[in-house]
Amino acid sequence: MQMADAATIATMNKAAGGDKLAELFSLVPDLLEAANTSGNASLQLPDLWWELGLELPDGAPPGHPPGSGGAESADTEARVRILISVVYWVVCALGLAGNLLVLYLMKSMQGWRKSSINLFVTNLALTDFQFVLTLPFWAVENALDFKWPFGKAMCKIVSMVTSMNMYASVFFLTAMSVTRYHSVASALKSHRTRGHGRGDCCGRSLGDSCCFSAKALCVWIWALAALASLPSAIFSTTVKVMGEELCLVRFPDKLLGRDRQFWLGLYHSQKVLLGFVLPLGIIILCYLLLVRFIADRRAAGTKGGAAVAGGRPTGASARRLSKVTKSVTIVVLSFFLCWLPNQALTTWSILIKFNAVPFSQEYFLCQVYAFPVSVCLAHSNSCLNPVLYCLVRREFRKALKSLLWRIASPSITSMRPFTATTKPEHEDQGLQAPAPPHAAAEPDLLYYPPGVVVYSGGRYDLLPSSSAY
C-alpha cells in the first residue's frame, strides 16, 4: 500500500521513533479492514492520519486529514455517525416488522409446505431477520465514535452472524431465481404435464422428491454460508487503537508465509466474488433464459396455431411474459442497486491491498464518507426482500388484508381470504380457504363495511384490489 512518498516517510521517521511509528502505521490496514467489513471504524481514519502526522497526497502540511476542516470537519463526521446510527435503527425496525410478518403469513398459510419457492422465501425471511438483529450493535458502535463496548466474545459473535446471514441472504436469492426458472420452464415445456406439478415441483405432498431436494438445498446453503463466514468467526477480535477498543477482523502478521495485506485482499475478494459477482451472474442468467424460453414458446405457439402452455391462448403467454419481465426488473435492479456501491468500494480496497493501485486521498475520503452510506444501502436490502418476494404477490396481499381486517373487526369471523373472482397463483392453489356453507336467504346487501361486502347467503368477500394482476 502506497500512503506516502519517500520524502514523507523520511519526515515521519524524524518526527517519531521508527518502532512506534511502524506500530501506528501498521494499524491503517486494520482500520481499512474494519471499514470494509461492515462500515465500522471508517471515520476513525482521520484521527489516525492526524496522529501519524502524515503529509497529505496533495502536499499540504500535516495536522489535518485530507479534506478536513478542523472542528467543522469533526462536527460533520459526528453528524454522519449519528445519521448512520439512526438509519441502522430504522432499517432494524422495518426489517424486524417486515420479516416477522412474512414468517407469520408463511406459518399461518403453511405456504412453505406447498412450494419450494415459498420454502426459500421462509428461509430468506429468517436470514434477513437474523441479519437485522445485528444492526443495533453496529448502530451503538457508530454512535460511540466506533468504540466497541460489548467485549471480545460479542465482537466475534456479531461479526460472524452478520457475515453468515449476508452470504445466506444472497444464496437464497440465487436459489429462488434458479427455482423460478425451473418451475416456469417445466410448466411451459409440454401441455402433457398440465396438472402434475405445474409451476411447483413440490406439488402438495411433503413426500415428493423435489420438496426434499429443496429442503436439502436449504441445509447446504446454510452450511455454505457458515463456511464462508469462518474467517470472520476466527479472526474477528477487539484491538486497541490509540487507546480505544475497536471490533475488527485482524489477520496475523505472517500466515502461511503471506503477510496480512494478502489475506485481507483475499478475504474481501471472497466477499465480492462469492457474495456478489457469482450470485448476480446466476440471477441475470436465469431470468434471461426464462424470458427467452417464454418468448420462444409464444412464437412456436403462434406459428403452429396451437396454444401456448398446454392450451392457453397466446394472449395469456404475453401476459405471463410481461409479468416475468417486470419481476426481472424488480429483482435484479433491487439486488444490483443495493449492493453495487458497497461492492465497488470493496473492490477498490482489494486493488490497494494487492498493490495494484496506490492509496490516494480520493480512496481515503470515500472510505470516510461514502463507504458508511453504501453499507446502509446494502443493509436496506433486508427490508426490501419481504416486500419484493412476498407482499407484492397477490395471494399474500389478500392474506394480509384478511389479517388486518380480522384484527380491526374481530366480530366478523366468516370472512374469506380470497374473492370469488381472484385465483391464487398456481404454486399456492392449496392455500385457498373453502367457501362457507350456504345459509338462509338474506337481503342482497346486508352489510357493507369498508373493504368488505356481505352478500346474500352469508358469504363475506373482500373488495377486489385495483392493484391485483
From Swiss-Prot:
Residues exposed to the Extracellular side: 1-81, 141-156, 237-270, 351-356
Cellular location(s): Cell membrane
Listed GO biological process terms: G protein-coupled receptor signaling pathway; neuropeptide signaling pathway; positive regulation of cytokinesis
Tissue/organ expression: Expressed predominantly in brain regions. Highest expression in substantia nigra and pituitary, followed by hippocampus, spinal cord, amygdala, caudate nucleus and corpus callosum, quite low level in cerebellum. In peripheral tissues, relatively high levels in adrenal glands, low levels in pancreas, salivary gland, placenta, mammary gland and testis.
Task of the protein: Receptor for RNL3/relaxin-3. Binding of the ligand inhibit cAMP accumulation.
Chain ranges on the Cytoplasmic side, renumbered to this chain: 103-119, 178-215, 292-329, 378-469
Segments crossing the lipid bilayer: 82-102, 120-140, 157-177, 216-236, 271-291, 330-350, 357-377
Glycan attachment sites: 36, 40
Protein known as: Relaxin-3 receptor 1
Family: Belongs to the G-protein coupled receptor 1 family.
Entry keywords, A to Z: Cell membrane, Disulfide bond, G-protein coupled receptor, Glycoprotein, Membrane, Receptor, Transducer, Transmembrane, Transmembrane helix
GO molecular function terms attached to this record: G protein-coupled peptide receptor activity; G protein-coupled receptor activity
GO cellular component: plasma membrane
Keyword DNA damage tagged: no
Cysteine-cysteine disulfides: 155-247
Membrane topology: Multi-pass membrane protein
The keyword Lipid biosynthesis appears for this protein: no
